[in-house]
């Protein structure tokens, strides 16, 4: 009986640890735990685009780590295939980060992004892909969502975000207006990616530093 209980507990812990995070709104392209460390979580094909506010709109995630560092960024490419597509528009304009770099504890969290304020020429009907980069301490993970931006679009009432996690006291000072000079190339052996992978510089180090700071505060 003891052995059986031990197995059950171990299985529960393992399954919980494997489920890193999900992008719940806007709905992600898909989720497979084993490929979440790849570009767009391993889902490299553009899906049906969902309506999303041109101005401020909510993003909902479910974080399965005790503490995780998050940042959001977008691509204006009709078919982004690498992190390079999230750095510049087709005419070479640098795309700022869509959110600050901030931390969240475990659980369902939300934050707001204002894509129109990025000043990269987005208008009513613009098509973009949103990518969330997440680090819970065991490497960067990704989820993507394909969107069409609608001026004045009202999200479902149950998807609004009033307790914005990116505005919490542990959010960093990196703003959505920061340039993509904060991105740098890093090679990856993950399948399904094309070209050099672009990741936020020092993202893992920042996550560690913020975690240490949190421990000191505690």
Curated annotation (Swiss-Prot):
Induction: Expression is highly induced in response to copper limitation by the copper-specific chelator bathocuproine disulfonic acid (BCS). The BIM1 promoter harbors three conserved Cu-responsive elements (CuRE), which are critical for CUF1 binding and activation under copper-limiting conditions, beginning at positions -239, -268 and -516. Consistent with their presence, binding of the CUF1 copper-sensing transcription factor to the BIM1 promoter is strongly induced under copper-limiting conditions and expression of BIM1 under these conditions is CUF1-dependent. Pfam families: BIM1-like_dom. Transmembrane segments: none annotated. It is found in: Cell membrane. Cu(2+) binds at residues 20, 65, 138. GO terms for molecular function: metal ion binding. Residues 1-19 form the signal peptide. It comes from the Eukaryota. It is a lipid-anchor; GPI-anchor. The keyword Nucleotide-binding does not apply. Residues 160-194 are annotated as: Disordered. The keyword Signal applies. Binds 1 copper ion per subunit. Glycans are attached at residues 87, 91, 124, 158, 170. Disulfide bonds: none annotated. Residues 191-218 form a propeptide. Residues 165-194 have a biased composition (Low complexity). Its cofactor is Cu(2+). Belongs to the X325 family. PANTHER family: COPPER ACQUISITION FACTOR BIM1-LIKE DOMAIN-CONTAINING PROTEIN (PTHR34992:SF11), HYPHAL ANASTAMOSIS-7 PROTEIN (PTHR34992). Interacts with the CUF1-dependent copper transporter CTR1. Lytic polysaccharide monooxygenase-like protein that has diverged to biological functions other than polysaccharide degradation since it does not perform oxidative cleavage of polysaccharides. Cell surface-bound protein that functions in the copper-accumulation pathway shared by the CUF1-dependent copper transporter CTR1. Involved in maintaining cell wall integrity during copper deficiency. Binds Cu(2+) with an estimated 1:1 stoichiometry and might serve as an extracellular copper ligand. This is Copper acquisition factor BIM1. It comes from Cryptococcus neoformans var. grubii serotype A (strain H99 / ATCC 208821 / CBS 10515 / FGSC 9487). The lineage of its organism: Eukaryota, Fungi, Dikarya, Basidiomycota, Agaricomycotina. The gene is BIM1.
């Amino acid at each position: 009986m003891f052995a059986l209980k031990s197995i059950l507990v171990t299985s529960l812990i393992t399954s919980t640890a494997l489920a890193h995070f999900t992008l719940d709104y806007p709905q992600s392209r898909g989720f497979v735990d084993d490929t979440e460390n790849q570009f767009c979580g391993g889902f490299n094909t553009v899906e049906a685009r969902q309506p999303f506010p041109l101005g401020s709109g909510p993003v909902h995630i479910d974080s399965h780590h005790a503490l995780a560092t998050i940042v959001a960024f977008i691509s204006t490419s009709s078919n982004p295939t690498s992190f390079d597509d999230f750095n510049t528009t087709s005419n070479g304009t640098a795309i700022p980060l869509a959110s600050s770099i901030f931390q969240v504890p475990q659980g369902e969290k939300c934050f707001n992004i204002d894509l129109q304020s990025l000043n990269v020429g987005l208008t009513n009907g613009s098509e973009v892909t949103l990518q969330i980069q997440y680090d819970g301490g065991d490497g960067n993970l990704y989820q993507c969502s394909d969107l069409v931006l609608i001026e004045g679009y009202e999200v479902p009432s149950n998807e609004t975000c009033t307790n914005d996690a990116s505005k919490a006291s542990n959010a960093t000072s990196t703003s959505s207006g920061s340039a993509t000079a904060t991105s740098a190339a890093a090679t990856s052996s993950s399948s399904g990616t094309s070209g050099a992978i672009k990741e936020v510089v020092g993202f893992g180090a920042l996550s560690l530093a913020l975690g240490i700071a949190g421990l000191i505060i505690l």
